[in-house]
Amino acid sequence: MSDARRLVDKLWSYCNVLRDDGVGTIEYTEQLTYLLFLKMAHERAQRELNPQQIVPSEYSWQTLLDAKGDALETQYRHILEELGKRPGVLGTIFRKAQNRIQDPAKLKRLIVDLIDKENWSATGTDIKGDAYEALLSRGAEDIKSGAGQYFTPRAVIQAIVDCVRPTVKDTVVDPAAGTAGFLLAAHEYASRGSESMTRTEKNHLQHDFAYGYELVDGTARLAAMNMLLHGIGNPAGDSLIEVRDALISDPGQRWSVVLSNPPFGRKSSLAMVGADGFEVREDRAIERQDFVVTTSNKQFNFLQHIATILDINGRAAVVLPDNVLFEGGAGETLRRKLLRDFDLHTMLRLPTGIFYAQGVKANVLFFDKKPAAERPWTDRLWIYDLRTNQHFTLKQNPLRRQHLDDFVECYAPEKARSERTESERFRSFTYAELIARDKVNFDVTWLRDESLEDTDNLPAPHLIAREIIEDLTAALVELEAVAAALEPASGGTPA
């Protein structure tokens, strides 16, 4: 058994102990995050060479070891509250933190038997990082927590990064970082051959290479800790995960690579309390000088934001739902802009059944930002169809990296795109062909769905049932969006 697997099993065993108290996987991982950070800060303060006091002594790990019973719970709550007021990484990890372990005896057991017995600073970053990632993955499977919406399939992330090929010279950002999956994969790829890098390059990789924005406090803390455990950033410095709505404004900074899977959902909304005391949600159209369209559509706004923050000649790969390909109005305007001002060179049509959010039909758009020019920058768009006649589920038949091998081979990141060749699943469409389509529709298919024509080639019944559920769920999401748009902007009615 690998060291990472041993650590995962050990951490998971304590999660099962707390499950009876109503503590879910993600809540447990949050508590681990707080305690792990405190223990690692304690180890850093105790080391012989260049000791560093990250956490004030009155909030230190030692105060938890010394406390018992109700005093332990009180001290733990006090630490969480006070450290959440601090700037930098401390503030990101402990912002709005709460104790979810109500039994002091179980909290003590977690502190003494699990966390304190490990020398976390001496444990390799690959072991700590892999163990933490495994916990996050299991947390994504916890449907009740809703954490799956922040989790992009690792096989998809790895394939995207293998195509974009970030280097130590790049700066990478994810404006919807989730638990930092894209940032970690990009860092791992760029770190290959680090033994021959200069000290300046290694310092850049650790402190300036990756940056992320995340709206949700709990998810941001998981992302920040995930990066620290993988050796990215400085626990005593500024956080590489910024807790904010990335869409609010242009940050001013530009990055050479953008990798992102913006949250699914059709509209951005703003929660307010009406005069009668009930919550009212109003669609929020984002108005920015750098945006070409004003819309409340979340995906369109993220696409516009990414277009802004990407540096000239920068590369982007963005996971977006099907409606971005064909929706009229703002959608058509943005598709025209993509073809004209960017080199939109590749699209991967993802299969269904691979996301924890049910009913999602998504694609990956790969594009490069170009300087202003009179002619359109897109020459041809290469589309790889990994959806037609493909049947995946989260558990029985999960998507794995090898399922994307053919796509990466067709993408051929090491070659000029002029050397690409078409195949059964890989076709190219010229700018003239795309711009001539109704509403500049990118929703292009050419493969025949064999399951509709050959009854002997039907998927297994449980796969058919799962696809029906996903289609119905997707339809329900659309109907809910319509219903929300039709609701009057007034307070709710008491139940």
List where the protein language model places each region.
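Non-catalytic, mostly N-terminal accessory regions of nucleic-acid modification and defense proteins
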Residues: M1-V168, G231, P235-I248, R349-G353, ...
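Conserved S-adenosyl-L-methionine
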Residues: G146-S260, F264-D276, A285, Q289, ...
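Short, contiguous acidic/charged loop-to-helix segments that flank catalytic cores in large enzymes
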Residues: S269-N297, D322-A330, P351-A357, A372, ...
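Short hydrophobic/aromatic beta-strand or adjacent loop that forms the aromatic wall/cage
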Residues: V360-V364, L381, L404
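Conserved Class I SAM-dependent methyltransferase catalytic core
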Residues: Y28, I160, L215-L222, V292-F367
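Hydrophobic alpha-helix feature that most strongly marks membrane-spanning transmembrane helices
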Residues: S191, L228, I232, P263, ...
